[in-house]
Amino acid sequence: MTRYIGNAFSLGMVPRHLLAFVRLSACDRPDVVDLVSCVGHADTAAVLGVPMARISVTLQPGDVLYVAQLRGGRLPEGCVTLPEGFGFDWIRVEIEPSVR
């Protein structure tokens, strides 16, 4: 099982599977230290405290993707902390067994 952190989700990340999307409260957000980063934007990665990694991810059954969905607009260039009025909505994407 691999646990990822990303700033977006694409249907191209999964071959024909059922998906479960769960919105997380601030208390339930993951510890980013143990996650594989697939955050493709440098400023978003800096704010989240993870390395920027423009990698292709194909999720498999048992994998989990934690999506940090930016709220408030685009981050200013070179941003390393969240500006006032910005935040992240956290969503856990879980891959279920194959659909036939």
Describe every region a protein language model picked out:
Residues 10-12, 57-100:
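Polybasic, proline/glycine-rich intrinsically disordered low-complexity segments
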Residues 1-31:
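N-terminal low-complexity, intrinsically disordered segments
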